[in-house]
Curated annotation (Swiss-Prot):
Gene for this chain: CHRDL1
Tissue expression from the record: Expressed in the developing cornea and in the eye anterior segment in addition to the retina. Differentially expressed in the fetal brain. There is high expression in cerebellum and neocortex. Expressed in retinal pericytes.
Known glycosylation sites: 118, 291
Protein name: Chordin-like protein 1
The keyword Cell wall biogenesis/degradation is assigned to this record: no
Natural source organism: Homo sapiens (Human)
Length: 456
């Protein structure tokens, strides 16, 4: 008979339930003396039941939790009854197998959001394996993902050391196991109750560094239960950490799987950030950029001389700045004192061209005041054919730290609109044929020129 929720044996089951113990229930008194239980940052009323959600595995339907009258959260494994048929059927979102003649009616109403990742649609609660998310994973590690309410949760899982020559794959886990090791299923476990103290509050973060996993994520590497201890600090030994999980959340904007993972957060291709080191905090003088799935970090070099006598250090910036520094003036363009051109407000335009390994990345950026941000249009071209095009919006503070950008002109919103409309046409046209000068010609639209008589 086919088993469900094969997770590597009793040790792993105990580990997941130990996570529930660490998570902690919390009593909260409100008006009318109502008692609530707090579990995973959610409130539950007395008597309310639910299945716990464990990333990256999704809802664990073979564990029931209930909020007791004294505010304790009690979780127990589901006891499955014996089935009296030859071919019991496993139903999605149910723990115990059923005989075909006792199946519940099909409900066509879908209440939960699906997820889209790398061109594939996954339903709420569905598990899958992702490749290429963690570039620094070890040979004994794999990436497990699950879909929950439209978001994709992925974890780096360290698989246990195998003692057999021919391991096999099992459902609902990216790790391979020895034949027979994964045969223990939730429904055949005893229905022990695991109590969670009401005065304990152990919240978990959705954006933790993979160098500092929370204790609840390390529960998978525990050797026994109860009496096992969690270990803080660096990742455990690869042979012991059979369930070490690093959680990242992938929003729907990462549909192509081109993301970088840093400090427990994900960044899209072309996105930049300052690294956050546990011992030093945010390192302002280092800038990292996501290049497809590889993060490239460079040190920011400050000028040796400044145009003012006493440059000032500003919090959040690497280099000193001159107080009251004015924007650069552009030769060949004349604007009035308020930065207007023919009565229309102008905004600075920046350009960056970077070439590496036969690939050209060209960026055009427009700085706006309302809202105060920079809109960056990124083109990646190889052998004259557009490989990738996307638009990202970043803060001015972040943009000032980006390398390779230079101020090329100032333009108006009307000219920028013409540029973006032409850009949309070129992005379709140049994705299937060679384009040599189309983008360069389009950029010229942003340059503002008066007629010889000075009329607008």
């Amino acid at each position: 008979m086919r088993k469900k929720w094969k997770m590597g044996g009793m040790k792993y089951i105990f580990s997941l339930l130990f996570f529930l113990l660490l998570e902690g229930g919390k009593t909260e008194q409100v008006k009318h003396s109502e008692t609530y239980c707090m579990f995973q940052d959610k409130k539950y009323r007395v008597g309310e039941r639910w299945h716990p959600y464990l990333e990256p595995y999704g809802l664990v339907y073979c564990v029931n939790c209930i909020c007791s009258e004294n505010g304790n959260v009690l979780c127990s494994r589901v006891r499955c009854p014996n089935v009296h048929c030859l071919s019991p059927v496993h139903i999605p979102h149910l723990c115990c197998p059923r005989c075909p003649d006792s199946l519940p009616p099909v409900n066509n109403k879908v209440t939960s959001k699906s997820c889209e990742y790398n061109g594939t649609t996954y339903q709420h609660g569905e598990l899958f394996v992702a490749e290429g998310l963690f570039q620094n994973r070890q040979p004994n590690q794999c990436t497990q993902c699950s879909c929950s309410e439209g978001n994709v949760y992925c974890g780096l899982k360290t698989c246990p050391k195998l003692t057999c020559a021919f391991p096999v794959s099992v459902p609902d886990s990216c790790c391979r196991v020895c034949r027979g090791d994964g045969e223990l299923s939730w429904e055949h476990s005893d229905g022990d109750i695991f109590r969670q103290p009401a005065n304990r509050e152990a919240r978990h973060s959705y954006h933790r560094s993979h160098y500092d996993p929370p204790p609840s994520r390390q529960a998978g590497g525990l050797s026994r239960f109860p009496g096992a201890r969690s270990h803080r600090g660096a990742l455990m030994d690869s042979q012991q950490a059979s369930g070490t999980i690093v959680q990242i959340v992938i929003n729907n904007k990462h549909k192509h799987g081109q993301v970088c993972v840093s400090n427990g957060k994900t960044y899209s291709h072309g996105e930049s950030w300052h690294p956050n080191l546990r011992a030093f905090g945010i390192v302002e003088c280092v800038l990292c950029t996501c290049n497809v799935t590889k993060q490239e970090c460079k040190k920011i070099h400050c000028p040796n001389r400044y145009p003012c006598k006493y440059p000032q250090k500003i919090d959040g910036k690497c280099c000193k700045v001159c107080p009251g520094k004015k924007a650069k003036e552009l030769p060949g363009q004349s604007f009035d004192n308020k930065g207007y051109f023919c009565g229309e407000e102008t905004m600075p335009v920046y350009e960056s061209v970077f070439m590496e390994d036969g690939e050209t990345t060209r960026k055009i950026a427009l700085e706006t005041e309302r809202p105060p941000q920079v809109e960056v249009h990124v083109w990646t071209i190889r052998k004259g054919i557009l490989q990738h095009f996307h638009i990202e919006k970043i803060s001015k503070r972040m943009f000032e730290e980006l390398p390779h950008f230079k101020l090329v002109t100032r333009t108006t919103l009307s000219q920028w609109k013409i540029f973006t409309e032409g850009e949309a046409q070129i992005s379709q046209m140049c994705s299937s044929r060679v384009c040599r000068t189309e983008l360069e010609d389009l950029v010229k639209v942003l340059y503002l020129e008066r007629s010889e008589k000075g009329h607008c």
